[in-house]
């Protein structure tokens, strides 16, 4: 079974939030799980945004980032580097799913999941979940 996790769900593995334990259990149960290379930047941005908002402190920010980086280096997350074709696919998804208000990063995650052959898609974003379901993914919702 090929699984993909977007940044909204992946973040729950590093920051205690509602449904965090469920995401961890899901990830452990799916073995090799892919995420897009853009998650490296998006997750870093998420941590900084949460620190600035006062949701986490600088220590937790550093610890979460270090743990994530260790997981990336060890292969716990399979980073899908993609290609120009993923950007073209993401662009096309805006037209393919006209009733889903996809943001650019949402479309890129969906394109990456398709490109790496995922059949399962984990997200904590309702709009993303609906779009993934419309594309035929088995969606695992963590919101």
Where are these regions (language model features)?
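Residues at the C-termini of beta-strands that transition into short coil/loop
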Residues: 37, 81-83, 143
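Short, well-structured N-terminal submotif of metal-dependent ribonuclease cores
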Residues: 1-41, 46, 50-63, 135-138
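Short glycine-enriched loop/turn motifs at secondary-structure junctions
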Residues: 26-28, 72-74, 115-116
